């Protein structure tokens, strides 16, 4: 079975189980933390895929990465994934769970990447209001600081990308020359 199907099926099953338990939001935060830790620490993926590491240690490591250690539903979901030999897919499962949660709750993920921290709260509020009117959903808004874009901004809304960065414009000029 391909990785996408496995991840999607597990994510949906975990979401439905969490929904029954009334813990879907707690699991969402745990899965966000887990996905973030996989992105920040590549050694985490290596550790999870290490055949010499016992299942119990993998479970403990994943629960620690979620930063929500007292939730029974989260522990149970991680145990099922690891015990079924699907630890290799856990990063994808976490990302698919996030997607499943946002879809069911009507949340739209918007991410603004700038060179400097956006301190203008009024501009953020206007942008969130504009996006929520256009998407007919609630906006989950994140700002990211990235000095590599030189100037301007990059706005990502779900699968749409608006790249108004100086770096992209310089690359376009470079390609034309």
Swiss-Prot record:
GO terms for molecular function: proton-transporting ATP synthase activity, rotational mechanism. The keyword Protein biosynthesis does not apply. It is found in: Cell inner membrane. One of its GO terms (cellular component) is plasma membrane. It is a peripheral membrane protein. The keyword Transport applies. Keywords: ATP synthesis, Cell inner membrane, Cell membrane, CF(1), Hydrogen ion transport, Ion transport, Membrane, Transport. F(1)F(0) ATP synthase produces ATP from ADP in the presence of a proton or sodium gradient. F-type ATPases consist of two structural domains, F(1) containing the extramembraneous catalytic core and F(0) containing the membrane proton channel, linked together by a central stalk and a peripheral stalk. During catalysis, ATP synthesis in the catalytic domain of F(1) is coupled via a rotary mechanism of the central stalk subunits to proton translocation. F-type ATPases have 2 components, F(1) - the catalytic core - and F(0) - the membrane proton channel. F(1) has five subunits: alpha(3), beta(3), gamma(1), delta(1), epsilon(1). F(0) has three main subunits: a(1), b(2) and c(10-14). The alpha and beta chains form an alternating ring which encloses part of the gamma chain. F(1) is attached to F(0) by a central stalk formed by the gamma and epsilon chains, while a peripheral stalk is formed by the delta and b chains. Belongs to the ATPase delta chain family. This is ATP synthase subunit delta. The lineage of its organism: Bacteria, Pseudomonadati, Bacteroidota, Bacteroidia, Bacteroidales.
């Amino acid at each position: 079975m391909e990785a996408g199907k496995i991840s999607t099926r597990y994510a949906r099953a975990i979401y439905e189980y969490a929904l029954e338990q009334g813990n879907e939001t707690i699991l969402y935060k745990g899965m966000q933390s887990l996905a973030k830790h996989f992105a920040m620490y590549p050694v985490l993926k290596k550790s999870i895929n290490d055949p010499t590491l016992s299942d119990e240690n993998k479970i403990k490591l994943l629960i620690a990465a979620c930063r929500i250690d007292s939730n029974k539903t989260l522990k149970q979901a991680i145990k099922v994934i690891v015990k079924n030999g699907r630890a290799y897919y856990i990063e994808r499962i976490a990302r698919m769970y996030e997607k499943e949660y946002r879809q069911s709750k009507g949340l739209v993920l918007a991410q603004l990447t700038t060179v400097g921290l956006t301190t203008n709260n009024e501009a953020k509020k206007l942008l969130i209001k504009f996006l929520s009117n256009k998407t007919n959903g609630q906006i989950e808004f994140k700002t990211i600081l990235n000095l590599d874009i030189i100037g301007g901004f990059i706005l990502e809304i779900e699968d749409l990308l608006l790249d108004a960065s100086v770096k992209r414009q310089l690359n376009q000029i470079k390609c034309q020359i």
